């Protein structure tokens, strides 16, 4: 039985978002690095740095904070395709979250990308998660 690293990322970010923590430490793999880069580019997290600790690499990401208020923005992250039930979609069937305000992260033959990038390139893939 393997680990679901994508679900681990989502759970870590969600737990840190609910609490008062502003930072999340995630084990670094190629998939996690690509997903965190997308989250950084889309503005869901503020900062990411790579940290080495006893021959293992971790990504330390800072969550985005509200101005003039305590706490972070409440982002909703939902895992869609999971190891027991894979969900695939062609580029025409990729769902739009909140009319395009949310982000769908896909795993395609050209790497991990957002729904907008996949529609522009005209490729579909496995729907990993929704973020809004």
UniProtKB/Swiss-Prot annotation:
Give the Pfam families listed for this entry: Ribosomal_S8
Give the record's keywords alphabetically. Chloroplast, Plastid, Ribonucleoprotein, Ribosomal protein, RNA-binding, rRNA-binding
| GO CC annotations on file | chloroplast; ribonucleoprotein complex; ribosome
Which GO MF terms does the UniProt record name? Answer: rRNA binding; structural constituent of ribosome
**PROSITE patterns xrefs:** RIBOSOMAL_S8 (PS00053)
* Cell compartment(s), UniProt: Plastid, Chloroplast
Q: Does the keyword RNA-binding apply?
A: yes
| Disulfide bond sites | none
Any single biological process term in GO: translation
Record's function text: One of the primary rRNA binding proteins, it binds directly to 16S rRNA central domain where it helps coordinate assembly of the platform of the 30S subunit.
Question: What is the name listed in the Swiss-Prot or TrEMBL entry for this protein?
Answer: Small ribosomal subunit protein uS8c
Q: Which organism does this record belong to? A: Illicium oligandrum (Star anise)
Q: Which gene encodes it?
A: rps8
